[in-house]
Amino acid sequence: MISERVSAYCTKIPLLAEVTEWALLREWALSEVYRITLRSGETRILKWGGKEMAQEAANYRRLVNPLHIVAPRIFDFYESERSAVMIMEDAGKYNLEQQPCPELFLEAARQLARIRDTATMNIEKNMPISHIHQYTETAFDFLTHAKDLLRSPRLADHSALSKLHDIFPQQLERLYHTQPLTLVHHDYHAKNLLIQGTQIMPIDWSISYLSPHLGDLHCLIDEAREYSHVPREEMLSAFHSAMEQDCSMEQLKWQVNIGGLCWLVKTLKWLVYGGTDTIPGSDEWVPDLMDELELLVSKIV
């Protein structure tokens, strides 16, 4: 059984007449993902996205593919005013959330380093200037997100935001002046890391953008510890071993901390300005995210 919002596309997608089986893989307010089986026996992934999640096909065309990032093949996509459907390669049955494994978390860290180096090398070579500007989150953007959090009724009185306000401008200036622009996934979590033997393929680039920050590694380190008890130092070492850029371990630790702050500020901004209305229960995420932000601020001060 498929939802009305997916069935609305059936007349627009001839391939769906060939589907013999639908298997729902994931569903939430702004996204539905199915594995579909065709009469030929082949499988594909069908993904419906609403609102900001509808831009994933555009992100593949303008970001992921031009930057030569390994990703599932997009066979076709169909866009309407407020939603879109993609037909994608079925690139793997299990992800790291379903089958957590210490060595694969370490490989995910190494893969992230390779992705960032590849993206940096190809941004100016393969992306039009207009797309670079369109997809770049600047230091000013992150400062604006932080100021918006200070103005939000729910978080305005939180002391961590006042401390962040004091240190963030200088830290962002250092980040953007010392680190190259690269691709940020912004949802580099176990659920989006497909297992391909001993390799990892990230999927779901719907909210990706360009920035130097390393929030993706911050998130991955937390999940590696939660799911597979992989120590933080081992994850940092794995990432460091795959980097092409010359960087000390101390510099890398700082990058992860400031990257974590960038990730938290952008995520919290989305949540408190409408995200909690979109995702039932997400209001409960905010206190933990603020505790995390407070901890990172204390590490940098």
What are these regions (language model features)?
Residues 25, 30-129:
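ATP-binding pocket architecture of kinase catalytic cores
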Residues 1-18, 280-301:
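Regulatory N- and C-terminal appendages and interdomain linkers associated
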Residues 80, 85-101, 145-150, 261-280:
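A glycine-centered beta->alpha junction motif in the catalytic cores
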